[in-house]
């Protein structure tokens, strides 16, 4: 299991997170700009409006800050 950070919670970042979680990786989706989208994704069902699907429950959603980069990630993706 790898720890993966995806920076950008738009359609591309969110869609990329799904197969990673299905393959038992720990994925954190972080959004630096669109706080309105971040708030929607943080709700219980994690519905993504562009993809029109509920994101996996195991997906961690977090507001981006420079502190997040100090964690030990196996992979960082900018989407």
List the predicted regions and their residue ranges.
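N-terminal Rossmann-like NAD(P) cofactor-binding module of classical short-chain dehydrogenase/reductase
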Residues: 75-78
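NAD(P)+-binding Rossmann beta1-loop-alpha1 motif at the extreme N-terminus of oxidoreductases
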Residues: 1-54, 59-66, 70
């Amino acid at each position: 299991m790898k720890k993966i950070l995806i920076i950008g919670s738009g359609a591309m970042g969110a869609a990329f997170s799904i197969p990673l979680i299905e393959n038992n990786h720990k994925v954190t989706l972080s959004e630096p700009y669109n706080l309105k989208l971040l708030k929607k994704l943080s709700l219980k069902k994690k519905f993504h409006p562009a993809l029109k699907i509920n994101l996996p429950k195991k997906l961690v959603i977090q507001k981006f800050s420079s502190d997040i980069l100090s964690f030990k990630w196996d992979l960082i993706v900018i989407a």
